[in-house]
């Protein structure tokens, strides 16, 4: 009868320390990969927008840089 409370306490202590399941780790990896992809797309869009602004400023100042347009 004394073993039952000790067993229950040990179960409660051991359950939070259980390793994550494979499914949870895969979900975390997919979420992290999605965020990384979103950051790359945002950065690429930001850089292309910055280049467009620089190109338009260059065309206003000197027409030789926008001969391709």
Swiss-Prot record:
Signal sequence coordinates: 1-19
Tissue-wise expression: Expressed by the venom duct.
One Pfam entry name: Chi-conotoxin
Segments crossing the lipid bilayer: none
Residue ranges of coiled coil: none
InterPro entries named in the record: T-conotoxin
GO molecular function, one term: toxin activity
Subcellular location: Secreted
Propeptide: 20-54
One Gene Ontology cellular component annotation held by this UniProt entry: extracellular region
PTM remark: Contains 2 disulfide bonds that can be either 'C1-C3, C2-C4' or 'C1-C4, C2-C3', since these disulfide connectivities have been observed for conotoxins with cysteine framework V (for examples, see AC P0DQQ7 and AC P81755).
Keyword terms, alphabetized: Disulfide bond, Neurotoxin, Secreted, Signal, Toxin
Family note: Belongs to the conotoxin T superfamily.
Domain notes: The cysteine framework is V (CC-CC).
Name of the protein in question: Conotoxin Lt5.10
Species this protein is from: Conus litteratus (Lettered cone)
């Amino acid at each position: 009868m004394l073993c039952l409370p000790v067993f229950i306490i040990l179960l409660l202590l051991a359950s939070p320390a259980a390793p994550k399941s494979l499914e949870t780790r895969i979900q975390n990896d997919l979420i992290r990969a999605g965020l990384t992809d979103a950051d790359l797309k945002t950065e690429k869009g930001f850089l292309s927008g910055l280049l467009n602004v620089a190109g338009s400023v260059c065309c206003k100042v000197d027409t030789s840089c926008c001969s391709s347009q």
